[in-house]
């Protein structure tokens, strides 16, 4: 027979680490080539001009320039697209 009360078990007590998703460079910001613009799961924001997409759907800058977001119509829903505009020296 038990001389101490047994402790109950629980199925809780775990949590995953945060993945630090989201926008890393906002509209109008200057970025360099290779810098991360958005970390995302899936393609909620589409890559535009001078923007590449990694295998985990991360968007990154292909050239130096400034960040610009635009809203586009894709099928029946509106989507966002991110572009990098490079300023040409005159």
Swiss-Prot record:
HAMAP family per record: Ribosomal_bL27 (MF_00539)
UniProt-listed GO biological process terms: translation
InterPro entries: Ribosomal_bL27, Ribosomal_bL27_CS
GO cellular component: cytosolic large ribosomal subunit
Protein's UniProt keywords contain Nuclease: no
UniProt GO MF annotations: structural constituent of ribosome
Family: Belongs to the bacterial ribosomal protein bL27 family.
Keywords for this protein: Ribonucleoprotein, Ribosomal protein
Protein name, per record: Large ribosomal subunit protein bL27
Pfam families: Ribosomal_L27 (PF01016)
Statement: the UniProt record of this protein carries the keyword Calcium: no
Record region (Disordered): 1-24
Superkingdom of the source species: Bacteria
């Amino acid at each position: 027979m038990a001389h101490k009360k047994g402790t109950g078990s629980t199925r809780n007590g775990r949590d995953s680490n945060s993945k630090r998703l989201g926008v890393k460079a906002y509209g109008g910001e200057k970025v360099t080539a290779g810098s991360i613009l958005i970390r995302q799961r899936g393609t909620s924001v589409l890559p535009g001009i001078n923007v590449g997409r990694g295998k985990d759907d991360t968007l990154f800058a292909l050239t130096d320039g400034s960040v610009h977001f635009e809203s586009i119509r894709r099928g029946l829903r509106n989507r966002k697209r991110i572009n990098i505009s490079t300023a040409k020296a005159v």
